Amino acid sequence: MPRRREVEKRKILPDPKFQDRIVAKFVNNLMREGKKSTGERIIYGAFDQVEQKLKDDPLKIFKKALDNVKPVVEVKSRRVGGATYQVPVEVRQDRRTALAMRWLIDYSKARGEKTMQEKLAGEIIDAANNRGNAVKKREDTHKMAEANKAFAHYRW
């Protein structure tokens, strides 16, 4: 953290196809070794598959899936005396989105389909329908926070 001034957040330009900043952010998260065009190809291909399977606007389905994966609370480790407690804290809005994107990508990679487009499309459809591993991760995070609610007074 710099002492001089608050660092301004970098502006993300909207993606070329949907003119949406969240999709552009998702492309940036998916991108490996600076290959943005490959990331865009994967996402747009996945969106095409989602549109074919559900006959609905893929952007709307993607945003619904993202909302279903966003965590509200998480636990952070806090050391008090000799003990480490898992303290539940509310998640900031930008971190919610970042975690949801990361979980969607991670659990897409772990799926059994052949191509990344198919994996991502499958995970987006599952998340939009409130099932799948990314949604399970959010539920587990919420359960962990609920179980450690007794330590909420250690918040900082």
Swiss-Prot record:
SUPFAM superfamilies: Ribosomal protein S7. CDD domains: uS7_Bacteria. The keyword tRNA-binding applies. One of its GO terms (biological process) is translation. One of its GO terms (molecular function) is tRNA binding. GO terms for cellular component: small ribosomal subunit. Transmembrane segments: none annotated. Keywords: Ribonucleoprotein, Ribosomal protein, RNA-binding, rRNA-binding, tRNA-binding. It comes from the Bacteria. It holds the Pfam family Ribosomal_S7. Gene3D superfamilies: Ribosomal protein S7 domain. One of the primary rRNA binding proteins, it binds directly to 16S rRNA where it nucleates assembly of the head domain of the 30S subunit. Is located at the subunit interface close to the decoding center, probably blocks exit of the E-site tRNA. Part of the 30S ribosomal subunit. Contacts proteins S9 and S11. Belongs to the universal ribosomal protein uS7 family. This is Small ribosomal subunit protein uS7. It comes from Anaeromyxobacter sp. (strain Fw109-5).
